[in-house]
Structures are given as C-alpha cells and as structure tokens.
C-alpha cells in the first residue's frame, strides 16, 4: 500500500509516531518483513520488533495486517 506524504503526516499526528516509526510503518505497508526492514534501515531485527511494538501500542492494534487496516480506516474517515 502506497500512501501520499500528507497521508503519512496525518497518521503521524494521529498517534504521535516518531520519524523512525513512520519509516518502519511505510516499509510494513510495502510488504517488507522484519528482516528486510532491518536491512533497509540498517538496524537490528530486534530494533525493528521494538519499533513495531511501539507502533502497535500507539495505534491500538496487534499485527501488521491490523495496522494497515487501521491506517486505511482512519484515512477513509478523514477523507484524506
């Protein structure tokens, strides 16, 4: 799923996501797994997991699929 810059800005503001959390979320939405995300961002696998845990907690979801569904739902409600 590819989102526009203003959509990412909106999502970031909704849940107070850090710039690194947004980077991780963008790669999740592109379908990358944790190992690929770590390689792309040059961070450890466990660091990716920590960022995802923080994102899931802030957004109130469990898992990548639910994260993407919540992003879509929020953007549809906001008509962005």
Feature locations, PLM:
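Short acidic alpha-helix initiation/capping motifs at coil-to-helix transition points
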Residues: 1-5, 46-47
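Basic, Lys/Arg-enriched C-terminal extension of HTH/homeodomain DNA-binding domains
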Residues: 5-11, 53-80
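The N-cap/first-turn positions of alpha helices
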Residues: 20-24
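A cross-family signal for key residues in well-ordered alpha-helices
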Residues: 26, 39, 69
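Short helix-to-turn junction characteristic of helix-turn-helix DNA-binding domains
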Residues: 28-32, 71
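Recognition helix of helix-turn-helix DNA-binding domains
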Residues: 31-66
């Amino acid at each position: 799923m590819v989102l526009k810059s203003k959509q990412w800005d909106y999502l970031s503001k909704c849940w107070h996501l850090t710039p690194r959390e947004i980077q991780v979320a963008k790669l999740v939405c592109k379908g990358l797994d944790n190992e690929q995300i770590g390689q792309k961002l040059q961070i450890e696998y466990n660091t990716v997991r920590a960022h995802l845990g923080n994102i899931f907690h802030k957004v109130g979801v469990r898992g990548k699929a639910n994260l993407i569904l919540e992003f879509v739902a929020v953007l549809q409600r906001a008509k962005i």
